């Protein structure tokens, strides 16, 4: 085919893709069912991971919860079991038929596994255990994350490595563990819970930003690889929220006059937006929508212009109060241990 004709056809496809994206933004697509599907969630013991578990439980997925903390993981599992019990009660919800929701003929279950996702041997062995005890995995939610809370020159090398391993490298291990069967079946969904700090950065959290940039790069490259393999049954969703009020960045502050218009996100809102994206096979979701604009402006504006905007918003040193709190907390712990 003549290259000019092919270029013209490509431009038509690009325009059509833009039109369809706008159409989906205006008219909410129908959500797919995940009932009965096996869903692995890393970092399920609290924060967003726990909320993801509850949302998937309400949709009657079989949950496989991974966390390094056994007690927190079991707490999440009990919340999931309570949701299952409420759904099994025919009087708990009103439905369309006779005022009662019909209960599906299968009984979803929840399984818990304690492991460190930063240790690839542990990830691979636990994944094999999941396949034996639960079955093949349909959905993988790479959610586990940590933050060191130190300025670069004050951060121990071990904490930098830990941040990179958990926030980025673990995605490689979990994906390598579960993707082969997804490719074989041409069915599956991989979700990367990243951060807006993986799209644009700020001072004081170099290790965290690098880990999230890495996770996003991995996700995007993997998405292209799956597209190149023509496995259209495997979906990918990238979740990039603004700062979420889970306590991970407690103390982070932008300019006080701006903060009412851009407060930390409620975790419940963040997860509901992410669930909507996952269940409609949306490739990427940024919350709030202004994150899309900030990322676009970062791509086209000179660095000096970005610095001016950061200083106006108070985003250049927004992490400093958080870092100071973490340092004070560590000093207090060291003082207590020295008594």
Swiss-Prot record:
The keyword Transmembrane helix applies. Pathway: Cofactor metabolism; retinol metabolism. GO terms for cellular component: endoplasmic reticulum membrane; lipid droplet. Its EC number is 1.1.1.300. Substrate binds at residue 195. It holds the Pfam family adh_short. It is found in: Microsome membrane; Endoplasmic reticulum membrane. Belongs to the short-chain dehydrogenases/reductases (SDR) family. This is Retinol dehydrogenase 10-A. It comes from Danio rerio (Zebrafish). The lineage of its organism: Eukaryota, Metazoa, Chordata, Craniata, Vertebrata. The gene is rdh10a.
């Amino acid at each position: 085919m003549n290259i000019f004709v092919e270029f013209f056809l490509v431009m038509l496809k690009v325009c059509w893709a833009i039109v369809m994206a706008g159409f989906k933004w205006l008219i909410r697509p129908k959500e797919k069912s995940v009932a009965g599907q096996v869903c692995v969630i890393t970092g399920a013991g609290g924060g967003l991971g726990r909320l993801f578990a509850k949302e998937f439980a309400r949709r009657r997925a079989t949950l496989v919860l991974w966390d390094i903390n056994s007690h927190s993981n079991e707490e999440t599992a009990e919340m999931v079991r309570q949701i299952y019990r409420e759904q099994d009660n025919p009087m708990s919800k009103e439905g369309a038929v006779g005022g009662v929701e019909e209960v599906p003929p299968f009984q979803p279950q929840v399984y818990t596994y304690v492991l460190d996702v930063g240790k690839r041997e542990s990830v691979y062995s636990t994944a094999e255990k999941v396949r034996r005890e639960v079955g093949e995995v349909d959905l993988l939610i790479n959610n586990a994350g940590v933050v060191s809370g130190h300025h670069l020159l004050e951060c121990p090398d071990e904490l930098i490595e830990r941040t990179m391993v958990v926030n980025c490298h673990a995605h490689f291990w979990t994906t390598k563990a579960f993707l082969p069967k997804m490719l074989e079946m041409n069915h599956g969904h991989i979700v990367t819970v990243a951060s807006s700090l993986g799209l644009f950065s700020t001072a004081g959290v170099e290790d965290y930003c690098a880990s999230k940039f890495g996770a996003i790069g991995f996700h995007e490259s993997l998405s292209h690889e799956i597209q190149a393999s023509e496995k259209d049954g495997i979906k990918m969703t990238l979740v990039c929220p603004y700062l979420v009020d889970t306590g991970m960045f407690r103390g982070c502050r932008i300019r006080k006059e701006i903060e009412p218009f851009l407060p930390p996100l409620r975790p419940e809102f963040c997860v509901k937006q992410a669930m909507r994206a996952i269940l409609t096979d949306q490739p990427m979701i940024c919350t709030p929508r202004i994150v899309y604009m900030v990322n676009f402006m970062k791509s086209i504006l000179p660095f000096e212009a970005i610095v001016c905007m950061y200083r106006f918003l108070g985003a250049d040193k927004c992490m400093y109060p958080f870092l100071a709190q973490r340092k004070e907390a560590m000093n207090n712990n060291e003082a207590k241990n020295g008594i």
